[in-house]
């Protein structure tokens, strides 16, 4: 599995992979990472990366020829994703599906985004990470890589970590409680469910499913209504 990130700001992307789980996964060659500076593909001698809008309006958009040149430099086969607020919301099912791809390319928007022709000519999919605006697509790209990489075999030390996570069964994950003794009086005022400690895994599983549904109903009524059973 390989990820290629096309961005005007490589320095915003690379530090994320210098620690923790994804660093170890890279060191084990469980996936590859390539970060390309879009400016290197600008035809302008000053590496200008943007243009004004036809018809006027505030802001600039990314040079479509620069984006095209950058995409052409990335070898096929590849699955190209543009990060933009106009895209569909990224979901857990997308992460699971994309983890089966051999090469995912993520193109990070900036300024007012992309010339529409860049999307029409280059994008296999367009994603956003929520109904809000960021200054660029780098954070979105990192979110996607992190979410996808967790589904690559070996990245997580314990594959069972994926089984009961939020969204895996359409509901939010059930509440978790640390197996430890605490000095804090405030923490001890809220005991963990007794069933968690009794060792009956079938009953624990049923309780967690019930709590998972309650949590989903409280925090994400939209999801609860979609999958109520």
Curated annotation (Swiss-Prot):
Residue ranges of the TM segments: none
Pfam families assigned: tRNA_m1G_MT (PF01746)
CC annotations in GO: cytosol
Listed GO biological process terms: tRNA N1-guanine methylation
SUPFAM superfamilies linked: alpha/beta knot
Location in or out of the cell: Cytoplasm
Catalytic activity of the protein: guanosine(37) in tRNA + S-adenosyl-L-methionine = N(1)-methylguanosine(37) in tRNA + S-adenosyl-L-homocysteine + H(+)
E.C. number: 2.1.1.228
Entry GO MF terms: tRNA (guanine(37)-N1)-methyltransferase activity
Keywords: Cytoplasm, Methyltransferase, S-adenosyl-L-methionine, Transferase, tRNA processing
Positions contributing to S-adenosyl-L-methionine binding: 109, 129-134
Family that this chain belongs to: Belongs to the RNA methyltransferase TrmD family.
Function text: Specifically methylates guanosine-37 in various tRNAs.
Record note on quaternary structure: Homodimer.
Name by which UniProt lists this protein: tRNA (guanine-N(1)-)-methyltransferase
Encoding gene per record: trmD
